[in-house]
């Protein structure tokens, strides 16, 4: 059977590395046929983390990181293809998100910035590469995010019940798939970003594996209440956010004396904050019938978060996308393969009901091989 393969590449706000997957669009629905992961080199991760947290850099430093990311993507792709016995000629196009370093959709001059030189990706892989997906949506009045709900709609929508796909990366975003209604999707809260930053600060670990550290802590009710009292949660959808809001500086401002608490108690409270802030939004959506919550992203591997979702959402069936045929770690990468397919065929790929754009458009800039 003829194959129609597109490669999706994603590196998210967690800075852990690069997700890659191949989708076969000869299938309906498209099928994930291969997936892989390349860890972020420590020196590049350190420089990116500093850039995201300090918000200050030089043009030279920004340009150098842009180049280094481009090389990382290209080398990751070549190694991935070799491991899966694929050649460049097997792949129709690459859809590469790039690395978000700033996302500010609501200012006087709205903009979003993803870096990683895609000229290098196209040149080094010999494959047409498509990137810069967000700015076209912003150019027609949208938030530039989230872009994945259109893909979720095609894969997970049901005519029988409300389905919400919750992606927990650095930030938590949802796709709301309601029968006979336009799909909507938006960022709802922080995801892993605060928990990751806090354990990195105190234990020099990238993340709290299996919530082991958080489980040793006790909830701090006053801190939790302060965190939940965030104006972002009162904004109407569609809306988007990022590390420029939810960071350790924000956390410090939410507490009169953060150092008075045991670090593990803060970690437990951050986990509860992530769970409750997401649940508060989901409860505004639930119907009388049982609803389905499909969780993907790194947060789906956090047993404490999954436990709290089940406890706090009695009307919902809580599952991971693994149980519905799509690996939890590669949903976003798969979405960018889909976005590349849409761009190659000049098909629209944003949903105005999701991003707030004035019109549907085909997203992405093409970098020929």
From Swiss-Prot:
Gene Ontology biological process: 1,6-anhydro-N-acetyl-beta-muramic acid catabolic process; amino sugar metabolic process; peptidoglycan turnover
InterPro entries: Anhydro_N_Ac-Mur_kinase, ATPase_NBD
Cell inner membrane recorded as keyword: no
UniProt keywords, alphabetically: ATP-binding, Carbohydrate metabolism, Kinase, Nucleotide-binding, Transferase
Keyword Kinase: yes
Family matches, as Pfam families: AnmK
Taxonomic superkingdom: Bacteria
Pathway in which this enzyme or protein is active: Amino-sugar metabolism; 1,6-anhydro-N-acetylmuramate degradation; Cell wall biogenesis; peptidoglycan recycling
SUPFAM superfamilies, per the entry: Actin-like ATPase domain (SSF53067)
EC numbers for this chain: 2.7.1.170
Amino-acid positions noted as binding ATP in the UniProt annotation, renumbered to this chain: 12-19
Molecular function GO labels: ATP binding; kinase activity; phosphotransferase activity, alcohol group as acceptor
Annotated catalysed reactions: 1,6-anhydro-N-acetyl-beta-muramate + ATP + H2O = N-acetyl-D-muramate 6-phosphate + ADP + H(+)
Gene3D superfamilies on file: 3.30.420.40
Function summary: Catalyzes the specific phosphorylation of 1,6-anhydro-N-acetylmuramic acid (anhMurNAc) with the simultaneous cleavage of the 1,6-anhydro ring, generating MurNAc-6-P. Is required for the utilization of anhMurNAc either imported from the medium or derived from its own cell wall murein, and thus plays a role in cell wall recycling.
PANTHER family listed in its UniProt record: ANHYDRO-N-ACETYLMURAMIC ACID KINASE
NCBIfam families: PRK09585.1-3 (NF007139)
Family that this chain belongs to: Belongs to the anhydro-N-acetylmuramic acid kinase family.
Protein name (Swiss-Prot/TrEMBL): Anhydro-N-acetylmuramic acid kinase
UniProt organism field: Actinobacillus pleuropneumoniae serotype 7 (strain AP76)
Recorded name of the encoding gene: anmK
């Amino acid at each position: 059977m003829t194959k129609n393969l597109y490669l999706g590449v994603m590196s998210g706000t967690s800075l852990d590395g690069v997700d890659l997957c191949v989708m076969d669009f000869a299938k309906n629905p498209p099928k994930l046929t291969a997936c892989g992961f390349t860890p972020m080199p420590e020196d590049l991760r350190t420089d990116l983390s500093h850039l995201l947290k300090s918000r200050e850099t030089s043009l030279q430093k920004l340009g150098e990181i842009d180049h280094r990311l481009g090389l990382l993507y290209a080398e990751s792709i070549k190694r991935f293809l070799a491991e899966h016995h694929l050649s460049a000629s097997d792949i129709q196009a690459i859809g590469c998100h790039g690395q978000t370093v700033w996302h500010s959709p609501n200012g006087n001059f709205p903009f979003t910035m993803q870096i990683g030189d895609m000229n290098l990706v196209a040149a080094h892989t010999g494959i047409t590469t498509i990137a810069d997906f967000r700015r076209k949506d912003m150019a027609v009045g949208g938030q530039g995010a989230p872009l994945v709900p259109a893909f979720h709609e095609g894969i997970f929508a049901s005519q029988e019940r409300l389905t919400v796909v919750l992606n927990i990366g650095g930030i938590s975003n949802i796709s709301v798939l309601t029968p006979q209604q336009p799909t909507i999707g938006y960022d709802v809260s922080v995801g892993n970003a605060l928990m990751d930053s806090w354990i990195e600060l105190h234990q020099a670990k990238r993340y709290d594996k299996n919530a082991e550290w958080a489980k040793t802590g006790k909830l701090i009710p006053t801190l939790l209440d302060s965190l939940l009292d965030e104006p972002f949660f009162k904004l109407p959808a569609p809306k988007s956010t990022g590390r420029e809001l939810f960071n350790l500086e924000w956390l410090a401002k939410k507490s009169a004396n953060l150092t008075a608490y045991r670090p593990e108690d803060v970690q437990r409270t951050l986990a509860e904050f992530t769970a409750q802030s997401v649940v508060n939004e989901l409860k505004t959506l639930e119907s009388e019938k049982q609803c389905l919550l499909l969780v993907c992203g790194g947060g789906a591997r956090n047993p404490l978060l999954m436990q709290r979702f089940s406890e706090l959402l009695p009307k919902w069936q809580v599952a991971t996308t693994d149980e519905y045929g799509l690996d939890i770690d590669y949903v976003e990468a798969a979405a960018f393969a889909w976005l590349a397919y849409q761009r190659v065929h000049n098909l629209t790929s944003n949903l105005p009901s999701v991003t707030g754009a004035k019109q549907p458009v085909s997203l992405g800039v093409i970098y020929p091989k």
